[in-house]
């Protein structure tokens, strides 16, 4: 039962531009390099292997900005980003020490707690939701108040049903008032072909831009907070909780990684042109798409709750967990302090 709940978002890009990116899978099962570390510029060198949630894309702009502009070098870190052959396995790859860190999804941390995986979120990469209800500009669906009688494309993830139920409740609709169709990873093609009236699971800063480039019109985008879904951190940095406790060198390297990520995030936000050029070199999107996606993404790296860059609000995690429980995604409530911490990022 847990296996079907594990993946909060398997990154629903079935468009050709994403699939053209070469999958980097060599060495998935090798041990992380580790290494003794100290702190900052005088620290012993360390290497960290980081499993990405999906192919490199503008959601990772801060990571690649750090990589290409010396922020990891300043922390005496060598960082390798890898798209694993199974992008849904990020937490298990860290739990089994096959990767040092993973970029993954907040919702999955609650599932990991119920599976007793030794993982913990240590920093926020994208501190606000990117998921959305999306429709073409001329769709019958123009917002949550127009979903009655509509066909909504979903990927078959448990969160899809929870989001749909939240929409139905907010509009006083019965289950059969809105039809959902499982289109797997083909959300964008399903929208473009007219197979569905709208879709859940599309990132407005990525798929929204791609749809606009295909149709010449801005799609209808309804963000999660407008649908009644509590705010959450879309992408987080995940470490091995047991290793953090037992290996001081690993814990120090993780902290230095987070410091570099935060510094690079702030620098990237102040260098839109440089960030655009940086992502052009690291993704397979068209230059035109990157020139639109990156400016849309950079502001999303700022917390909606006024938190310092990279930091978590455990209160917000608690609220999101309660929403998951109320939508039958969890068997019991999970204490957010057991799955997320600010202890490894100075300034939180």
Identify the role of each PLM range.
Residues 13, 17-19:
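Hydrophobic helical h-region of N-terminal Sec-dependent signal peptides
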Residues 27-30:
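Bacterial signal peptide processing site
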Residues 36, 40-184, 188-193, 197-205, ...:
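Short, glycine-/small- and polar/acidic-enriched structural segments
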Residues 317-348:
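Conserved C-terminal helix/tail region of periplasmic/extracytoplasmic solute-binding proteins
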Residues 247-327:
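Secondary-structure end/capping motifs
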Residues 107-108, 186-189, 195-283:
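Pocket-lining segment of extracytoplasmic ligand-binding domains
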Residues 2-13:
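Bacterial N-terminal signal peptides that target proteins for export
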Residues 22-25:
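C-terminal motif of bacterial Sec signal peptides marking the signal peptidase cleavage site
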């Amino acid at each position: 039962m847990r296996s079907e709940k594990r993946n909060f978002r398997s990154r629903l890009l079935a468009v050709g531009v994403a699939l053209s990116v070469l999958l980097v899978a060599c060495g998935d099962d090798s041990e992380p390099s580790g290494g003794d570390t100290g702190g900052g510029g005088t620290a012993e060198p360390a290497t960290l292997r980081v499993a990405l949630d999906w192919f490199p894309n503008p959601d990772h702009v801060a990571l690649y900005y750090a990589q290409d502009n010396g922020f990891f070098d300043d922390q005496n870190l060598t960082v390798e980003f890898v798209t694993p052959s199974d992008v849904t396995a990020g937490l298990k790859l860290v739990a089994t020490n096959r990767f040092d860190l993973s970029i993954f999804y907040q919702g999955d941390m609650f599932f990991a707690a119920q599976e007793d995986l030794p993982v913990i979120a240590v920093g926020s990469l994208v501190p606000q939701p990117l998921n959305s209800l999306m429709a073409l500009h001329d769709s019958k669906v123009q917002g949550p108040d127009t979903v009655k009688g509509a066909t909504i494309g979903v990927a078959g993830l448990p969160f899809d049903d929870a989001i749909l139920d939240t929409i139905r409740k907010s509009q006083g609709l019965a289950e059969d008032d809105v039809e959902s169709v499982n289109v797997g990873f083909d959300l964008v093609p399903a929208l473009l072909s007219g197979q569905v009236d709208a879709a859940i699971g599309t990132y407005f800063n990525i798929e929204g831009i791609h749809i606009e480039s295909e149709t010449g019109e801005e799609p209808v985008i309804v963000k999660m907070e407008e649908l009644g879904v509590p705010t959450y951190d879309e992408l987080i940095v995940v470490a091995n909780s047991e290793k953090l406790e037992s290996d001081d060198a690993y814990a120090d390297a993780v902290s230095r990684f987070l410091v570099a990520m935060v510094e690079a995030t702030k620098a990237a936000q102040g260098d839109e042109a440089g960030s655009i050029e940086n992502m052009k070199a690291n993704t397979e999107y068209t230059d035109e798409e990157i020139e639109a996606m990156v400016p849309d993404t950079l502001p999303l790296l700022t917390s909606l709750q006024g938190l310092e860059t990279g930091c978590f609000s455990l209160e917000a995690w608690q609220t999101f967990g309660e929403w998951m429980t109320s939508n039958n995604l969890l068997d019991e409530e999970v204490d957010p302090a057991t799955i997320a911490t600010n202890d490894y990022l100075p300034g939180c």
